[in-house]
Amino acid sequence: MKALTARQQEVFDLIRDHISQTGMPPTRAEIAQRLGFRSPNAAEEHLKALARKGVIEIVSGASRGIRLLQEEEEGLPLVGRVAAGEPLLAQQHIEGHYQVDPSLFKPNADFLLRVSGMSMKDIGIMDGDLLAVHKTQDVRNGQVVVARIDDEVTVKRLKKQGNKVELLPENSEFKPIVVDLRQQSFTIEGLAVGVIRNGDWL
């Protein structure tokens, strides 16, 4: 892959962040508006440059016809420390990519999350491990999830009842996190589907 200019990197980051937040790429008009271009045509020129450099594919005839190629080549993105209020898969959180077959996990893994702390050690999730995560909000009680409470991201076992959510640790030294859905912001970022021990698998 050829190196990107600062402006091209900005466009690429916007596309990736938009996909992670909404599930679809932005239109040319949205790119122009977000980055202060005078017209969608200016955004189109940057997209053509990104396509020439092999990081995106432009699908003709569709206003959102942009496909990222980089992740497919590089493997699963590894998410490190997440800044408050930002999308989990925002470009600045991605430490690198691992060549891991997503289909080794059931359901397929969409990204890896670096585990911080020992609150889940009793089920073999240790500090520094890479947690394979399937991006979904369709989860059930008893499953281990990646959750965001207000602006904090955590890995815990889910127990939801009415307007109350308990996020249960798997370590007796830690207390459950209790969330009142009427007062706190709560989002499921994904379902834990496997563990890679301390980055041994590259």
Swiss-Prot record:
CDD domains: S24_LexA-like. Changing G85D: In lexA3, resistant to cleavage. Increased sensitivity to hydroxyurea. Coiled coil: none annotated. The keyword Transcription regulation applies. SUPFAM superfamilies: LexA/Signal peptidase, Winged helix' DNA-binding domain. GO terms for biological process: DNA damage response; DNA repair; DNA replication; DNA-templated transcription; negative regulation of DNA-templated transcription; proteolysis; SOS response. Pfam families: LexA_DNA_bind, Peptidase_S24. InterPro entries: LexA, LexA-like, LexA/Signal_pep-like_sf, LexA_DNA-bd_dom, LexA_repressor, Peptidase_S24_LexA, Peptidase_S24_S26A/B/C, WH-like_DNA-bd_sf. Disulfide bonds: none annotated. The keyword Methyltransferase does not apply. One of its GO terms (molecular function) is sequence-specific DNA binding. Disruption phenotype: Cells are filamented, accumulate DNA double-strand breaks, have viability defects at 10 ng/ml ciprofoxacin. Synthetically lethal in combination with a priB deletion. Residues 28-48 bind DNA. Its EC number is 3.4.21.88. The active site is at S119 (for autocatalytic cleavage activity), K156 (for autocatalytic cleavage activity). GO terms for cellular component: cytosol; protein-DNA complex. Represses a number of genes involved in the response to DNA damage (SOS response), including recA and lexA. Binds to the 16 bp palindromic sequence 5'-CTGTATATATATACAG-3'. In the presence of single-stranded DNA, RecA interacts with LexA causing an autocatalytic cleavage which disrupts the DNA-binding part of LexA, leading to derepression of the SOS regulon and eventually DNA repair. Implicated in hydroxy radical-mediated cell death induced by hydroxyurea treatment. Homodimer. Belongs to the peptidase S24 family. This is LexA repressor. The gene is lexA.
